[in-house]
């Protein structure tokens, strides 16, 4: 969702070099962004302050002489490394009262996440030109072939992503029934935390058995992808794969799959989006009432 910001920076500043400080678990995806020169893997545990480690990294980056840091997360701790690196221009949203840590501050406005980030390419208060550049990831055809061979895939296959680490309110419960209707080899993808979601679904279950980069390459070779609102959904969109994205407690207007090859299924219930991890009303209608037939209809429309 942040890649349109990077593309817009390259448009506005020809010749600019962009390095990306990213968590290790997403670094492999960031390295496939054509706008990025170098990815620096952040050595921090999720949610941990690790003040000394942030200071050490900041002092090391000081030697690179960066002109500007754009801080995307809203947390206080995420602004520490650019501050310790003495980067002269440090911009981002106010977030957790980051006065001083950042010196070019933006006020949050309601918007889709891609637009939210793209605003950081303009002075505060100025809207970026639209439409925004579409996200895209680089994958060579040989990498796709090698990944399929590595996991024993010989013919066309569909990728299903039944997990969503955010919580049960984002997980559609009928992937098993869908897989039984497809008439094509099925590959299940997700992280180790998604293993329970893949239980009982017929197909080549690779959930928790691939790296993120391997999953990316398998998605790049898929005939189509069906997923919940998840990180793999956004990867499929950036790869331009035909896909159907299923939304329950979240809002496809806020975090859509940014691709013309994407279809969205969302029931528009009065209680949705609630953004809850577990249905606060106990009925889970936003996903329970999303039928297999609805999803199959959208899959069929991908080839129309």
Where are these regions (language model features)?
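Catalytic machinery of carbohydrate-active enzymes
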Residues: 1-304
């Amino acid at each position: 969702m942040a890649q349109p910001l990077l593309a817009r920076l390259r448009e506005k500043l020809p010749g600019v070099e962009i390095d990306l400080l990213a968590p290790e678990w997403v670094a492999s995806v960031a390295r496939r962004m054509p706008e990025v020169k170098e990815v620096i893997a952040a050595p921090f545990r999720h949610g941990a302050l690790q003040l000394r480690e942030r200071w050490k990294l900041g002092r090391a980056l000081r030697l690179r002489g960066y002109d500007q840091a754009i801080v995307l997360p809203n947390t206080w701790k995420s602004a520490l490394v650019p501050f310790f690196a003495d980067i002269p221009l440090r911009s981002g949203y106010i977030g957790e009262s980051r006065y001083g840590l950042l010196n070019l501050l933006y006020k949050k406005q309601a918007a889709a996440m891609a637009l939210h980030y793209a605003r950081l390419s303009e002075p505060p208060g100025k809207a970026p030109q639209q439409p925004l550049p579409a996200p895209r990831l680089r994958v060579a055809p040989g990498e796709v072939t090698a990944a399929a061979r590595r996991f024993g895939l010989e013919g066309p296959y569909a990728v299903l992503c039944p997990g969503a680490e955010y919580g049960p309110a984002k997980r559609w419960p009928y992937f098993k029934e869908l897989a039984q209707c497809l008439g094509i080899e099925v590959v299940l993808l997700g992280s180790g935390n998604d293993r329970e979601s893949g239980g009982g679904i017929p197909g080549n279950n690779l959930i928790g058995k691939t790296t993120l980069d391997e999953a990316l390459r398998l998605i790049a070779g898929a005939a189509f992808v069906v997923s919940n609102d998840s990180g793999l959904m956004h990867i499929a969109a950036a790869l331009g794969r035909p896909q159907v994205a299923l939304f329950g407690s979240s809002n496809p207007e806020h975090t859509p799959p940014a691709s013309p090859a994407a279809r969205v299924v969302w029931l528009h219930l009065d209680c949705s989006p609630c953004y809850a991890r577990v249905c606060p009303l106990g009925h889970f209608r936003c996903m329970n009432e999303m039928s297999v037939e609805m999803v199959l209809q959208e899959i069929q429309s991908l080839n129309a």
